[in-house]
Structures are given as structure tokens and as C-alpha cells.
């Protein structure tokens, strides 16, 4: 029901006369992690993950009625997600492993935006949903210098979806500098060789991005 209301609002904005629209290039840095839960407390204590620094790059289309600060944004973004991992547990596996898991997604975000103009400077906030498709992935274990290419068993294994929100500043209606928090809702668990397996894993990304509008 909520998604229907979002699409209805976007359709209403598109049909509004005097629509002001811009196409832009978006680039940024991702600080990605995975939220994991384990069924055993000792495994949970021995396994933890930190942020993986990645990238995002793509196109965005922003539109709003000229007499209103409310509008929408849609994009096509290449986004690198994943996490670093550290496993040190003598009780469970008598081993130490460190490395990172990397997933490269093509994402389509759909956001409602509100912009407040203050002369040549503007501030904006947004929120919405996204859908992603994993193009490739790998797990690198640095302690053993091995790389495992991610194998996706089905189309659904490549999919990710969730919500995002953020805010930023805009200069001359051309340059936008902002931050975004993205939280996945789909369980993206996949096997990592010789490591304990979580019961659930979802993507979380904090990104800092720059947009140039034409």
C-alpha cells in the first residue's frame, strides 16, 4: 500500500505543468558493511566485520514542479558493497582468517526529494526505495591469499532491495554534495569457505556523494 502511494505521488508530480528536470552524473565513496546474525554465541563472538570502502558511479534524473520544492529522483548506479571480516576462534575452528567480501551491484534508486532554496544555495533531503542486481562478487581471504568468485545459483540470488534516505547541500542548482544511508531488506547470505555461516546478512551502506547536474 505504501509503495502505491509513492508511485501515485510521483505520477502526480510528473503530470504537473511547469516541470523542472535535470540529468546528472553521480559519483561517491561507499562505506559498506553487512549486518549479520549467528545462531551460536561463541561464533558470534569470534566473527565480526567492519566497513569495506567501495565506490558508486552512475546517472540520476531529478524533477520537480518549478513552483514547488517537492520532487522525485530516479537513477542507475554502479555500487560496490560488502564488508571486511575477521575470524579468530580457537574454540570453534582453531583458526585465524581475515579478508573481505565484495559485491558489485547495478542499482535503481527511486526517491522523493524536498529542496529548500536559500539564494544560490539550497538544502535538500530525500527518502525512498532501491532495487539492485549483483553483476559480480568475490571473497578474498588475505591470510591465505585466496580468492573465491561469488557463484549465484539463481536470478533471485543476485537481487537486493531496501530503503535509503539522506540529505545534502546544493550550489547554483548544479552541484550537490550529500550523504546517504542505505539499508538492505533482503537476506544476502552466501557461503564463505571455511568460515562460520550467519543465519542472516543484509547490506548496509553509508555513502558520501557528489552530483553534477546538466
Please place each PLM-identified region on the residue numbering.
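Glycine- and aromatic-enriched membrane insertion/assembly motifs of diderm outer-membrane
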Residues: 24, 40-95
